[in-house]
Structure formats: structure tokens, C-alpha cells
Amino acid sequence: MIGEFLMKKFVLFFLLIIALTGCGLNQNTNSNKTESNATSSATATGSSTSAAGNSQATTKQDDHLIAAKQALSAGEYTKAIEEATASIKQDANNGEAYSVRGFATALNGDAAKGLTDTKKAYDLDPNNVANYYNMAMVYKLQGQLNDSKQWFAKVLEKDPSNTWSVYGIATIYADQGDDTKALDWLEKAIKIDSSVKSVAAEQDHFERFHNNRRFKTLVGL
């Protein structure tokens, strides 16, 4: 029960980050960019045809996908699932929609089913780094911390300065009891973005570190 409570607090924080930056959902995962990364396979299909009907379908699909991301950021998981499903119905090869639906499904209480969708998203588009982040979060929700850590690491292979993937790894090491690595990774995250200090100081992952001299120095307690 305690682990589940801590995980929910972790997820709520990351949804706030998503709402502010779009990380892992509708934005490029590069921490210093905010341009949209929501182009789906349906958009590409629509651009290759002059048929008005196909163009209209593409617009509607984009609307569903955008609505799904907005609902997810707002914590409206059921709506996010419904909108992503509508997007998938219009294009069964829309990997981004599968990724969003998978994350929403996991947050809605079915991490195993959510993982099926995020894996499908990877099969459809193995180069979608945003889905790597979602995979990491879904594995974390399922308690598979080593798998989660591997997917955060895959994000960092493409984007070494992705603050919240670095921080995600720090929290995993903290939860696993590896204090040295937890603080090493926390220090890396803080060097990328100093706002991590206040986050780490307040999150339960690092609550037991509050008397740790190195931790106090890192976060300024």
C-alpha cells in the first residue's frame, strides 16, 4: 500500500511536468525544446494524397490525439483512452495514439494492458523517443523498476539532457536502496535543471535522505 501511494505521488508529479512541458507525450523529449512532436502516421498519409476526404480524416484524427494528450495531462484517464482509441480507429498504425492510450490505461489502473499498447507503439514506430519515456513510466507503475530504468536510459541515449529521465533513474535507485547511485543521478539531474532541487526535497522518494549530508547539500536543505 505504501509503495502504491508513493508511486501515485510520483505519477502525479510527472503529469504536472507533462502538463507544463509535454515531456513524453506531445512534445519533443529534448528538455530545452517545446515544439510539437504530435505528427502521426495519419498525417503523413494525408499529406501524400490529394483526396479531400482523407485530409478531413487526418484533421479529425489529429483532433482526437490532441484531445487524448490534453485529457491525460489533466488526469482524465478515461477520456484520454477514449480519444486515443478513436484516433486508432481512424488509423490502426498510429503508434503515437497507442503510446498515449497505453500510458493512460496504466494510470487508470491496468498497467499490464497499458504495457501492451506501449509495446505496440514501439513496434509501429521504434524511433519515437517520447514512447520510450512512456514505456519507462508504465514499467514503473507496474513495479518493474529495472525495466523502467532501461527505458529511461534509452531516452537518454537519444537526448542526454532529458532532465526528467535522469531524475526518474535517480528515484528508481532511491527506491531500490542504492543511495550512492541515487544521489549521483540526482546530482546529474540538478546540473541539467536546478528546479529539480525543490522537487527532490519534497518527494517521498528522497524523504529518508533528509538527514543525508550530501543530499542536503545538493538540494539546499
Question: What does each model-identified segment do?
Answer:
Residues 27-36, 45-53, 191-221:
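Terminal, low-structured helical/coil segments at or just beyond the last alpha-helical repeat
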Residues 100, 134, 168, 202-203:
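Canonical tetratricopeptide repeat
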Residues 90, 124, 158, 192-193:
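Structural marker of alpha-solenoid helical repeat scaffolds
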Residues 74-83, 107-120, 142-154, 177-185, ...:
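Structural signature of tandem alpha-helical TPR/SEL1-like repeats
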Residues 57-96, 100-103, 107:
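Alpha-helical segment of the N-proximal tetratricopeptide repeat
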Residues 20-22:
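C-terminal motif of bacterial Sec signal peptides marking the signal peptidase cleavage site
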